[in-house]
Amino acid sequence: MAELATIARPYAEALFKACAAQPGADLGSTVAWVDELAAIAADPQVRQLADNPKIESGQLFDLIAGVVRAPLSDAARNFLRVLIDNGRLEALPEVAAQFRALVNRQSGSSDAVVHSAFPIDAAALAELGASLEKRFGRKLNLSVQLDESLIGGVRVAVGDEVLDTSVKARLEQMKAALVA
């Protein structure tokens, strides 16, 4: 089977072009519903159901549309129906990632994942975001993931760049220096 990135690219590009063609289209809300649908499609139980040949595409569509938090827009319903009818539901998480990349490219921003040993409050996250935007030279869309193994500090991943200021990383550097 073809790689998911190859399958997902035309769907992500078509969705992006369709959103860009609509006057006053809100790409942020589109990213939100695409991400939500991707999370549902990535669920192992949904995958198992989608792979079951006894389940019709209409049943699968109704199930997924019924699970989302808010009612789907017509565009979201049509997009989901196309993916299901073409047997491409497994590509939806990759479609979401590529769509986010297209939106970020247009806005000149990047997604950044902040790994922290402890929860970060809104004020500290805003301050961290401002300093990271200065460091990376672009607007960042921050998301936080807790990782207690870091002991303290943060590790930030922006695309393929990583900034690691965690206690764990410093301890590993000290260990390497002492062993060498």
Curated annotation (Swiss-Prot):
It comes from Paracidovorax citrulli (strain AAC00-1) (Acidovorax citrulli). This is ATP synthase subunit delta. The keyword Magnesium does not apply. NCBIfam families: ATP_synt_delta, PRK05758.2-2. Keywords: ATP synthesis, Cell inner membrane, Cell membrane, CF(1), Hydrogen ion transport, Ion transport, Membrane, Transport. The keyword Cell membrane applies. GO terms for cellular component: plasma membrane; proton-transporting ATP synthase complex. GO terms for molecular function: proton-transporting ATP synthase activity, rotational mechanism. It is a peripheral membrane protein.
